[in-house]
């Protein structure tokens, strides 16, 4: 059910991506399922790059560098592969937007939220957690909110700001 809900939402990711690109932004889209990521990349009209778990280190480094240099304005990431140790914040003056499919893992979500929002970024970032209301994702969003609030409480309230 989760995979189907995420796959059904791919056209929304595409529409938001195209709108963001038309407004002069770069986009990072985070997915939980490879099928959704591939469908997204097949539907978007702009060139894109990807960060996935089974890619070679050289490919990953090149894809990150191309996105950071704004050679490519769209980066599609598997949320588990695009979390730790990845900086995709604005270094060139092109604002970043992240579109995030919800996951049960608060840690993965927190990591995804940190990819484009960094000290030293040249422009503000915007981040959207997109879930399909009335589906299993509503439950996921509620569970995620509880987990993120627990993390927030443990860290003295300084990590998540207005998303809660």
Q: Language-model features: where?
A:
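Conserved RecA-like P-loop NTPase helicase motor core
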Residues: 37, 49-139, 147
């Amino acid at each position: 059910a989760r995979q189907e809900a995420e796959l059904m939402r791919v056209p929304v990711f595409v529409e938001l991506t195209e709108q963001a690109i038309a407004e002069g932004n770069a986009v990072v889209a985070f997915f939980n399922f490879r099928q959704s990521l591939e469908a997204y990349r097949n539907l978007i009209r702009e060139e894109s790059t990807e960060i996935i778990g089974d890619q070679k280190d050289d490919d990953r480094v090149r894809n990150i560098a191309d996105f950071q240099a704004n050679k490519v304005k769209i980066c599609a990431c598997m949320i588990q592969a695009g979390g730790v140790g990845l900086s995709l914040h604005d270094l060139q003056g092109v604002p970043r937007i992240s579109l995030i499919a919800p996951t049960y893992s608060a840690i993965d979500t927190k990591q995804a939220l940190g990819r484009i929002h960094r000290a030293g970024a040249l422009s503000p970032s915007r981040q959207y957690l997109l879930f399909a209301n009335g589906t299993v994702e509503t439950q996921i969003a509620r569970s995620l909110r509880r987990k993120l609030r627990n993390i927030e409480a443990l860290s003295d309230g300084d990590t998540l700001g207005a998303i809660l």
